[in-house]
Regions:
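Active-site rim/adjacent substrate-binding subdomains
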Residues: 6-172, 177-206
Length: 206
């Protein structure tokens, strides 16, 4: 008989986990801090599963709550895993009028545990964002162009890092999930209602 996970039943071992989609109420849960005693094999398994799930979707970012785990953990990888693939268009910066593309290289997985934004810049940039929890829906969202983040790695070590461009946008998007916020929550009530109606229509067709 296996010993129960220290992190509870959320951390059942599996490779590709189910991604929660709106209107699942669990997406509105505020995630809790990963405590010192929770760093260990179970956390590594969760992160491995999150990457596997994100790549399978596919996506470039995923928060733990999106797979039903209300912990302050997120993973990001802006790169595909095909050296022969063309550059990937990740979004349009309407403020500065250019596409953000990234040359296809090997995977560059990033893990952020207990992330905290220290000083978001005042300048905003508009990206067309999407989300694995709101499939096939895209909308313009304004976010700070740069930010400095403090976070822990899988060993519990603390780091500080300045981010900009798509990485800054993706980090802020995923950190919203930790507070129970979806990118569509940044839209006006009318636009959000239209988006949800469109999503219902897509699901009916599917």
């Amino acid at each position: 008989m296996l010993a129960p996970s220290r992190l509870g039943p959320y951390f059942a071992k599996m490779a590709i986990r189910e991604i929660l989609e709106v209107p699942d109420s669990r997406l509105k849960i505020v995630s809790t801090v990963v405590e010192p005693h929770e760093f260990g094999p179970d956390l590594v398994t969760l992160v491995d599963d999150m990457f596997e799930t994100m790549y399978d979707a596919p996506g470039i970012g995923l928060a733990a709550i999106q797979v039903g785990v209300p912990k302050r953990v997120l993973v990001i990888d802006l790169q595909p895993d095909d050296p022969d693939a063309p550059p990937v268009e990740c979004g349009h910066d309407h403020e500065h009028g250019h596409e953000h593309t990234h040359t296809a290289t090997k995977k560059e997985p990033r893990v952020f545990i207990n992330p905290v934004i220290l000083d978001p810049a005042g300048e905003l940039s508009t990206y067309q964002e999407g989300c694995l929890s709101v499939p096939e829906i895209y909308a313009d969202v304004d976010r700070p162009v740069t930010c400095r983040v403090r976070y822990q790695d899988l060993e519990g070590n603390t780091h500080e890092e300045a981010l900009d461009g798509l990485m800054a946008t993706c980090l802020q998007h995923e950190m919203d999930h930790l507070e129970g916020i979806l990118f569509i929550d940044h839209l006006s009530r009318l636009k959000r209602a239209m988006v949800l109606k469109k999503l219902e229509k897509i699901r009916r067709i599917a």
